[in-house]
Amino acid sequence: MTNYFRSGDEIHYDCEIFEQTTSKGQGIRFYFDDITTLFPAEERVATIVYNVGLLINDAESIDDSEYLLNIDDPVIKTTGRAPMENAVKAIHMFKECVEALRHKYSNYKIAFACGWLDSRRHDAYRRVLSKMGFYETVVDDEPSLFRTYPAIDWIGYEQMKMAEMEEICDGE
């Protein structure tokens, strides 16, 4: 995970980047841009809001500057040689990224907004993310899939993880 900071005219971006390479040499990269300041102060009390960007491309050709410089108007071409493998890996990776960010900022509610470039991606994202509790709304004048996760209750979280481990052990 890498932090990128870019100062624009009046906008400050904090972008967390997670990446993996698939068996076919494709790079999957998630960009989590902190857009908390776009929301009114009363709506963002103890909340961090991320806009989620996804880039799948040849691992050697991924260039952060292409994404970060076009962050306000991202038109990025993505390719995929193994769409099913990439989709499965991206779903697992997204869940891991969400958990990592929730743990990093455990005292805050964390919200994620996922946009799309075309109707094909909208349908795919909606199908996957709606199963994860995301719903359609408008964020920063753009249609998005959105979800807010509560701050982590560490006692409840530890109890939940222990119960999961007991289920795994009982199943073996």
Residue ranges, per PLM feature:
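Non-catalytic substrate-recognition and accessory regions of acyl/acetyltransferase enzymes
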Residues: 1-172
